Amino acid sequence: MKIFVDGDGSPVKETVIEVAVEKALDVVIVTSVDHYSLKDYPENVSFVYVDKGADAADFKIVQLIKKGDLLITQDYGLASLVLPKGVLVLHQLGYQYTKENIDGLLEQRYFSGQIRRKGGRTKGPKPFTDQDRTTFKQALIELVKRSL
């Protein structure tokens, strides 16, 4: 199992790396060149940089990820593309995307978009908290434990 991270704007990269080091798992962070970093990372962490542009990281993840891998993303659309490949998908708030819940999530996203296009307002995400990070870490550890 490799852990892939949809890295653009992900608040849990460091948490994923911490857990992956403990469990001796490889991490692949896919992000745009805008987020290039010279920071030193553990040996098991690699970066794949993609051009700027909507969905460039998503398309690269779909290309690279394999059955049995784990993806960390908040992107419902990306989750829906990799679930049929047998990939486990975890949201940064700690809930797992599944074949059973993805259609409802996509439908909710669609209707929210319709409201916004008509000039309406929908609730945006709340700021990411330390409690969110703790919840995510526990969910990640549990999912990895069940999958190995």
From Swiss-Prot:
Transmembrane segments: none
Pfam family, one: DUF188
Signal peptide, first to last residue: none
InterPro entries: UPF0178
Full protein name: UPF0178 protein EF_0842
The organism's place on the tree of life at top rank: Bacteria
Source organism of the structure: Enterococcus faecalis (strain ATCC 700802 / V583)
Family of this protein: Belongs to the UPF0178 family.
